[in-house]
């Protein structure tokens, strides 16, 4: 075996070893690249998913805001309609006259005076235009018209003896009925 052969064998062995190292390095590099590409793909998918979540969240928020705004507008419109109805009822009550007004006023006066003892002197207050009517209705009773109040009609009565004050005005009756029946009124108006 000559020196040339030995050198050639060493070179072949070195080349083979270099080839093995190069292949191992390429394989490792391929693994690193594949891992990096997989990481990049995972990060890209996570970011896309996050963007999709944000888009969905913003869409839901926008939709919720629009629904809330629409609901508030509907409620505002309903409130306006209910106020108009209330105003119309007030106007109808204020427009009562003749026998119907007398009948209602007398009924309210009777209910009011029933709250006081028979021997109590009762001061009665009423709507400006009803003073003559109420004076006529309190004749021969333990009551006297003592003044006017700002109301649609009906009476307010009080007694110094018992410190009782009874409000049976059309206004107070309307408010009471309105409060008690608001849900039913709303359902009838808006078919809920």
From Swiss-Prot:
BP-aspect Gene Ontology terms: proton motive force-driven plasma membrane ATP synthesis
SUPFAM superfamilies: V-type ATPase subunit E-like
Alphabetized UniProt keyword annotations: ATP synthesis, Cell membrane, Hydrogen ion transport, Ion transport, Membrane, Transport
Disulphide bonds in the chain: none
A GO MF label: ATP binding
Major localization class: membrane
Pfam families, per database record: vATP-synt_E (PF01991)
Function: Component of the A-type ATP synthase that produces ATP from ADP in the presence of a proton gradient across the membrane.
PANTHER family: ATPASE H+-TRANSPORTING V1 SUBUNIT E1A-RELATED (PTHR45715)
Protein name in UniProt: A-type ATP synthase subunit E
Species whose genome carries this gene: Halorubrum lacusprofundi (strain ATCC 49239 / DSM 5036 / JCM 8891 / ACAM 34)
Gene that produces this protein: atpE
